[in-house]
C-alpha cells in the first residue's frame, strides 16, 4: 500500500508540474487517458481529451489516415459529416457506432479564443474487423531452376492481416534451413504482404499450398489449397520444335527455288507484258454522223 501511494503521489506531482510549466510557457495542458483505443466494428468508442489552463477553450478534432484528412469537430461543434454519428463533450468525443473506415489518428487541439494558449494530444482508433478468406495465386506448373511468385491477400481485416504459408499441411518457416522438411528449398516469405517467392525452384517444391490470414482479432482464416508442380525443362521438346521449324523453312525455300528454276516467275511476267492496247482515232465524218472506232487487241 505504501509503495502504491508513493507512486500515485509521484504521478500527481508530475501532472501538477506539467500544468504549471504549461501555464508559465503560455501552453495549456492537454492529455488523454487512453492513447490507443481498440473497438470491434459497429460498437461505440470514446476518445478522451481533457485539458486545463484555458480561460475560454476552443476544441477541434482532426482525423488523419494515410492521405485521408477530415475535420470531426470545429469550435466545440461536430461537423456536418459526423453530426449523426459523433457526440462532443468537454472530455472528448464519442462515436455511436464505428466502422472500419473510422480507423486512424485523431488529434484533439485546444486553444484560447485569443490564440495565446494552445495544446494538443493524439488518440489512435483501431476498429477491429476479422480477416476474410484470403485470395491465393499459385501457378499450377513451374520450371525447375526458374523463379516462382505465390501471392496471398485479404482486404477486410483491421488491423491489417499478417500471413502464413503451409505446404502439404506443414507451416513454412521464415528461414527454410531451420526445418528439415524445407532444407532443400530456397524461398523468401513476407508475412506483411503475403508474398512467397521461390528462387530458384527445386524439385522438392512440388506440393499443395495453403495460405492463412490473421490479425490478432477473431480466428485465423485459411485460403483454398492449390497444387503446384515443379517440372524439368523439356529440352527434347524444344529441340524437336526447332527441328520441325527448320524442315518447314527448308521446304519453303526449296519450293521458291524450284518455281524460279522452272521459269514460272518469268512466264508470269511475260504474260503480263504481252497485253497491248491499240487505239485508233475516229475518221472525220459529218457532224450528224459520229461513230467511235476503237479496237483492243490482246
Swiss-Prot record:
Cytoplasmic side stretches: 259-298
Protein transport found in the keyword field: no
A biological process term (GO) from this entry: memory T cell extravasation
Keyword Nucleus carried by entry: no
UniProt keyword terms in alphabetical order: Cell junction, Cell membrane, Disulfide bond, Glycoprotein, Immunoglobulin domain, Membrane, Phosphoprotein, Repeat, Signal, Tight junction, Transmembrane, Transmembrane helix
Extracellular topological domain: 25-237
Positions bearing carbohydrate: 184
InterPro entries, per the entry: F11R (IPR042456), Ig-like_dom (IPR007110), Ig-like_dom_sf (IPR036179), Ig-like_fold (IPR013783), Ig_sub (IPR003599), Ig_sub2 (IPR003598), Ig_V-set (IPR013106)
Similarity section: Belongs to the immunoglobulin superfamily.
Assembly and binders: Interacts with the ninth PDZ domain of MPDZ. Interacts with the first PDZ domain of PARD3. The association between PARD3 and PARD6B probably disrupts this interaction. Interacts with ITGAL (via I-domain). Interacts with CD151.
Free-text note on domains in this protein's UniProt record: The Ig-like V-type 2 domain is necessary and sufficient for interaction with integrin alpha-L/beta-2.
Identification of the protein by name: Junctional adhesion molecule A
Lineage: Eukaryota, Metazoa, Chordata, Craniata, Vertebrata
Amino acid at each position: 500500500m505504501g509503495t502504491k501511494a508513493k507512486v500515485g503521489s509521484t504521478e500527481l506531482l508530475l501532472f501538477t508540474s506539467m500544468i504549471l510549466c504549461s501555464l508559465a510557457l503560455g501552453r495549456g495542458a492537454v492529455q488523454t487517458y487512453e492513447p490507443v483505443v481498440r473497438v470491434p466494428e459497429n460498437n461505440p468508442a470514446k476518445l478522451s481529451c481533457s485539458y486545463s489552463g484555458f480561460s475560454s477553450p476552443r476544441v477541434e478534432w482532426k482525423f488523419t489516415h494515410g492521405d485521408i484528412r477530415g475535420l470531426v469537430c470545429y469550435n466545440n461543434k461536430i461537423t456536418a459529416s459526423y453530426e449523426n454519428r459523433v457526440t462532443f463533450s468537454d472530455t472528448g468525443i464519442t462515436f455511436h457506432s464505428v466502422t472500419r473506415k473510422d480507423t486512424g489518428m485523431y488529434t484533439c487541439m485546444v486553444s484560447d479564443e485569443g490564440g495565446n494558449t494552445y495544446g494538443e494530444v493524439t488518440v489512435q482508433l483501431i476498429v477491429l474487423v476479422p480477416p476474410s478468406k484470403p485470395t491465393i495465386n499459385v501457378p499450377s506448373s513451374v520450371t525447375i531452376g526458374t523463379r516462382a511468385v505465390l501471392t496471398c491477400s485479404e482486404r477486410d481485416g483491421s488491423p491489417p492481416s499478417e500471413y502464413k504459408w503451409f505446404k502439404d499441411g506443414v507451416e513454412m518457416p521464415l528461414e527454410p534451413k531451420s526445418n528439415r522438411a524445407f532444407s532443400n528449398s530456397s524461398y523468401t516469405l513476407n508475412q506483411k504482404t503475403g508474398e512467397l517467392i521461390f528462387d530458384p525452384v527445386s524439385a522438392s517444391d512440388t506440393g499443395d499450398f495453403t495460405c492463412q490470414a490473421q490479425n490478432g482479432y477473431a480466428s485465423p482464416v485459411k485460403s483454398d489449397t492449390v497444387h503446384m508442380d515443379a517440372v524439368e525443362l523439356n529440352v527434347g521438346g524444344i529441340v524437336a520444335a526447332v527441328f520441325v521449324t527448320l524442315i518447314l523453312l527448308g521446304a519453303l525455300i526449296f519450293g521458291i527455288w524450284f518455281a524460279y528454276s522452272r521459269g514460272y516467275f518469268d512466264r508470269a511476267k511475260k504474260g503480263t507484258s504481252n497485253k497491248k492496247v491499240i487505239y485508233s482515232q475516229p475518221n472525220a465524218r459529218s457532224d450528224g454522223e459520229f461513230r467511235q472506232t476503237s479496237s483492243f487487241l490482246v
